[in-house]
Amino acid sequence: MIRRSILIPAPSHMEARPAVFLDRDGTLTRYAGFVLEPSQLRLESGSVESIVRLRAAGFAVVVVTNQSAIGRGMMTEAQLADVHRELLWQLDAADALIDAIYYCPECPTESNETVVESNDRKPGPGMLLQAADELHLDLAQSWMIGDRMSDVLAGINAGCRGSVRVRTGLEPPSAPATSASDIETVENIVAATDVVLGECGHQAA
């Protein structure tokens, strides 16, 4: 089950464009366990700068996040909407625009986060595939940035050009199902943005 908090539709005549998919907790925002209310949400250092740079380079920016707190009964979808309104407010205040937020409320039953239990929940590609369909995105030219193996594997499973892992979130509990050498790991979202822009021929800031 995939839900969407916001969506800025792309014009129907627009050519498919590349995107950077961002995990929320531990990547775009500081990792704080289950974020159940707006006051708990803090942007990760460099998030605003990174979004501005990516959009200036022609990328759509889409947040894709597993939110199992809903499936666990810890919060409602209305409460999550309040958290996402706070996220949008903080980003909008700094002129950092995102195109959409997709989330999966399902609760995992498998402890190994590299196993695809559901197409909708990362590491399944469902959120990325739905975003590509609704926003007219070119997955083959798109990237995934996240702190967990489930994030980067979602990018691989969706057929993205690349996935970059950041060290700002929670360390994953299990080894990847694919070679770790295939996944570049950097310190934070700023360094990950440098990787994406460098690979695409844009000069790093």
Task: Write out the residue ranges for each language-model feature.
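Short, solvent-exposed loop/turn segments at secondary-structure boundaries
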Residues: S39-Q40, G73-A78, V115-E117
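Basic, amphipathic juxtamembrane/active-site segments
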Residues: A32-E49
